[in-house]
A protein has these predicted regions:
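Extracytoplasmic
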Residues: 75, 80-291
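Short glycine/acidic-rich loop motifs that flank beta-strands on beta-rich extracellular proteins
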Residues: 338-341, 353-354, 358-364, 389-396, ...
Length: 706
């Protein structure tokens, strides 16, 4: 346990702190006036007198936002500590994902593994159900008076609770309390909400559970018809296609608790929520706030850490001052109301840590300049939270956490919550590094590299509950090149894919962990769609683990693969595509799919795809589903628990006497199988037609060590 800190300004009475901050803000007016008048000399080697003044006051102003946290103090160890609730990663035994996914500071514990008086829901992977959107596809349902209790696996002073509440009858959500106790005492209350959950209907979705179909002229699988063209008109049950059911909330516990201490989450009697579903608990040791002493402290420029007044202009003033004096901007602990974009260029902004510094509001975002205006360079954002207020999907709205064009920039250790997209970059731009961020509860994507993003890295990010692709590269009109997604974790995207690559050159997707995609997508996706430029150079998909993917595609009424290649706009045949060292675990349908769409089935092909050193642990149907013309090679692809024929080869659905239009090349070492024998049997090669659109689905066993 680290030593307790000496008493800081945070320990003073609130009135004394308020007086100190008032003095600081008053002095800041003088500092800003001097800076504007040009009376502060610029020095490269050392800060100016005004900058030193700001630095000296930074520490004294630090305490305001930390008042609620209290000092860290561990309780004495229990004489007989309880066995800890199992720690998982994406609801997996961590050994099955070792070396893959984001390296995070928290321990994940699933509610279904905890002690509870509630009811287990799931397992179920059927879209539009509460279990389907839960991590591991199970959760615990509580009614008032019931609880779920977790035993801490390690010291912790902070928790994150992932939960679901009912919607209001007419939409818009409700709020309800959740009591948190540690070792049966120290009760705190969280106010949960479903105001950011519950979308319905067809794209781009609605918040109204009683809304009629948004697109009655679209074919829907529920009636296997186009409702507007069907007589008699089908009766469509309401609410239609409920989704995006979960949210999460964080809580500082006020002190450090030890491994073996118990965290109990109780729905109090009289709760307005008929039920509360708890999916999981993340626990961690946050520690003390970060202090940036030699910085332009935003408090000194009028920023309000209580969140009552808008701080956007004050932050702009701090940025302008910092750029003139070659200083970073520091956002001390607190909540800062910002209801527009903060435009950043050539500036470093750091907070006290994402648990202590929050920038919150309608339309809040940190944006680089538009690429057409030259874009921004040298932007460095770190150690704060961005809390948006986005409740509906409007694709033209620029309400993303981070946006614009930012070359030679870094985005590190942010927590981005309730924005439309966590980070959406519109290039051309180059050399941005996005690392160690937590991106949750987004209406659309977690991150998107859109249009001409090059030489950039996304690493060690944790993404959960997005409403579209978790991480995406979209090479629309101008190609992306030499970008890498490495060691990220993506869990429970409610629509589309965990990681999606739409065109581009020399791309790497490596050592990621992707779990529980829900519908109209899967874990890993390579697609020539949405007007993307062709794949060229190389595409390397290496050392990733997926679990509980290979989802049902409701528009096609078939199952996808954990990794799926989709040729729609053009061929996928110019790049050298290497899919190497991946593990596809507990696949609902297939492990691998290569597919086109019916209107273009005789116009497009997929070629130059090579699968090597792959492990497939359980498929509901096949290892490979081929529904396109082309070819692929396979080497050392080992499979077990295969639920149907190993290769479901439909080709382009012309069924010529010469065999399928898709061929599989055997490079040796393809072992294992399942219900029909060896998955890569000689009789299937190179292009035997084995097409079965809807074979019986055999639920695979839980993944286990190979």
């Amino acid at each position: 346990m680290p030593p307790r800190r000496a008493a800081s300004p945070a320990a003073r009475a609130p009135e004394a702190v308020a007086e100190a901050v008032a003095e600081v803000v008053a002095d800041a007016e003088v500092v800003v006036a001097v800076a504007v008048a040009g009376g502060v000399a610029r020095r490269r080697a050392a800060p100016t007198r005004a900058a030193a003044f700001l630095a000296a006051l930074t520490v004294s102003a630090l305490g305001l936002g930390a008042l609620g946290a209290g000092p860290a103090a561990a309780r004495p160890a229990a004489s007989d500590p309880a066995a800890p609730t199992a720690v998982t990663r994406a609801a997996l035994d961590p050994a099955l994902a070792e070396g893959r996914g984001a390296r995070v500071d928290f321990a994940e514990q699933e509610a279904e593994n905890a002690v509870t008086t509630g009811t287990l829901i799931g397992p179920d992977r059927t879209a539009y159900s509460l279990p389907a959107e839960a991590s591991g596809r199970k959760a615990v349902r509580l009614v008032p008076g019931q609880y779920v209790e977790f035993t801490l696996p390690a010291a912790a002073d902070a928790i994150t609770v992932r939960y679901s509440l009912p919607d209001a009858p007419a939409g818009g959500g409700i709020t309800a309390p959740l009591d948190v106790t540690v070792n049966g005492k120290n009760r705190r209350s969280m106010t949960l909400t479903s105001q950011y959950s519950w979308l319905y209907n067809q794209y781009p979705f609605s918040n109204d559970p009683q809304a009629d179909l948004l697109h009655p002229d679209w074919w829907i699988t529920e009636c296997a018809c186009v409702p507007a063209a069907t007589t008699p008109a089908p009766v469509i049950a309401k609410p239609f296609r409920p989704t995006h059911m979960y949210d999460e909330q964080r809580l500082l516990l006020g002190r450090t608790y030890r491994a073996g201490d118990t965290i109990r989450l109780t729905v109090p009697a009289g709760s307005p929520a008929a039920w509360t579903v708890i999916d999981l608990l993340d626990s961690q040791r946050v520690g003390a706030p970060h202090v940036e002493a030699a910085a332009a402290n935003a408090l000194l420029f009028g920023a309000d850490p209580t969140g009552r007044r808008d701080s956007a202009d004050a932050i702009d003033r701090a940025i302008a001052f910092a750029k003139r004096h070659r200083l970073p901007v520091y956002l001390p602990p607190g909540t800062y109301q910002v209801n527009r974009h903060i435009i950043v260029d050539g500036v470093t902004i750091t907070g006290a840590g994402s648990w202590y510094t929050t920038v919150k509001g309608k339309g809040v975002g940190f944006y680089g300049k538009e690429a057409a205006d030259g874009g921004s360079r040298g932007v460095h954002l770190s150690r704060f939270a961005i809390e948006g207020d986005v409740r509906e999907r409007v694709d033209t709205d620029q309400v993303n956490g981070v946006g614009g064009a930012m070359s030679d920039s870094t985005i590190d250790s942010l927590h981005i919550h309730h924005t439309k997209v966590g980070l959406w970059f519109d290039g051309p731009m180059s050399n941005v590094k996005v690392t160690r961020n937590v991106i949750t509860d987004q209406i659309a994507d977690g991150l998107n590299f859109h249009t001409g993003v090059t030489d950039s890295l996304v690493q060690d990010n944790f993404v959960r509950n997005t409403g579209d692709d978790g991480l995406a590269m979209w090479a629309e009109k101008t190609t992306n090149a030499r970008n890498t997604f490495d060691h990220n974790t993506v869990q429970s995207p409610t629509l589309a894919n965990g990681i999606a690559i739409y065109g581009g050159a020399d791309t790497t997707v490596s050592a990621n962990l992707v779990a529980d995609p829900v519908r109209e997508g899967s874990a890993l996706h390579v697609g020539s769609r949405f007007g993307a430029e062709p794949f060229t150079g190389s595409l390397r998909v290496e050392g990733n683990t997926t679990v509980r993917s290979g989802t049902y595609e409701l528009n096609w009424n078939i199952g996808l693969g954990a990794i799926w290649f989709y040729a729609l706009d053009r061929n996928i045949d110019q790049a050298d595509i290497q899919v190497t060292g991946n593990s596809f675990l507990d696949n609902t349908y297939n492990a691998i799919m290569l597919v086109s769409d019916w209107p273009v089935k005789d116009k497009v092909r997929i070629e130059n795809v090579h699968f090597k050193d792959i492990r497939v642990d359980g498929t509901g149907t096949s290892v490979v589903s081929a529904r396109v013309a082309g070819s692929a090679s396979f080497e050392n692809v080992d499979a077990r628990g295969v639920g149907a024929v190993g290769v479901n080869n439909c080709g382009s659905f012309n069924f010529p006497a010469t065999g399928s239009e898709f061929s599989l090349a055997d490079r040796g070492g393809n072992d294992g199988g399942g219900t029909t024998g060896p998955w890569f049997a000689g009789w299937e090669l190179p292009n035997t037609i084995t097409c079965d659109d809807r074979p019986p689905v055999v639920a695979p066993p839980a993944p286990s060590p190979w």
